[in-house]
Amino acid sequence: LLFIFTSLRLFSQSNEKISSILSSEKVTYGEVCYLVATAQGFVDDDASYEQAIQVLYDKGQMKSIVYKNEYIPLVNVTFLFSQLWDIKGGLMCRLTNNSPRYVFKQLKSDGVIESSKDSSSFVSGRYALSLYTTCLYYYGNQELKVE
């Protein structure tokens, strides 16, 4: 847990929002988009979830606008986190321009996600933050992608 707070502090996310995400039974699009948008410097740490969603949509990192309180399936959590680093995927990742399905499979193959996890499952905020820090540990030797 200390590693989570330390790594997230590097990206200046609001402690209040991080606490809220940690206590979420099921993480939402707004929460995940906030993490991704603040990590890339697209929004300030006091930005709303709606602003984070909008900026990721405007930057082409999301295909559509979603409702901030809509639960996000794990496959889309991994896809949004993949926007932070240049994850070297296999052939299908490259052929599909890093489609969410193949990014999810790549993270499983890399050992970032447990093999028992289902792509359509909803995960807690605690799990999403743990996944975020695992990605940071695994892929974090690279610079963050900022477009």
Language-model region placement:
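Terminal recognition/anchoring or ligand-binding modules at protein termini
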Residues: 12-34, 38-46, 64-147
